[in-house]
């Protein structure tokens, strides 16, 4: 397993090399795509990217939790959480170590 992290800059550089846009245009394209995804998720929409996976926003209701150290009950407030479900193709690719 690698400890490398893929960044916006890495994505922009990949678009620059593979698509042929200028570095500035590549960075703008990546920013635009990420902004659209962020906006959709912030408004509660589901984002489905074919052969990659699905991002969804779920509302979790209030509940009573427990402090693991003390055993005291603690109220947990309602919140929205972001979830990602990878596609079957992505699961297979990760399981194969990215060799597909």
Curated annotation (Swiss-Prot):
SUPFAM superfamilies linked to this entry: IHF-like DNA-binding proteins
Gene3D superfamilies tied to this protein: IHF-like DNA-binding proteins
Any GO MF annotation of the entry: DNA binding
Gene Ontology process terms (BP): DNA recombination; positive regulation of metabolic process; regulation of DNA-templated transcription; regulation of translation
A cellular-component GO term for this protein: cytosol
Keywords from the named record: DNA recombination, DNA-binding, Transcription, Transcription regulation, Translation regulation
Function: This protein is one of the two subunits of integration host factor, a specific DNA-binding protein that functions in genetic recombination as well as in transcriptional and translational control.
Stored NCBIfam families: himA, PRK00285.1
Assembly, per entry: Heterodimer of an alpha and a beta chain.
Homology family: Belongs to the bacterial histone-like protein family.
Protein name: Integration host factor subunit alpha
Name of the gene: ihfA
């Amino acid at each position: 397993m690698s400890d490398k992290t893929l960044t916006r800059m890495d994505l922009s550089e990949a678009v620059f090399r593979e698509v042929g846009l200028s570095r500035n245009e590549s960075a703008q394209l990546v920013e635009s795509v990420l902004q659209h995804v962020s906006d959709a998720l912030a408004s509660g929409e589901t984002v489905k990217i074919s052969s990659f996976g699905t991002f969804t926003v779920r509302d979790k209701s209030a509940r009573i939790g427990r402090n693991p150290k003390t055993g005291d009950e603690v109220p947990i407030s309602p919140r929205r959480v972001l979830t990602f479900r990878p596609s079957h193709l992505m699961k297979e690719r990760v399981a194969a170590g990215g060799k597909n």
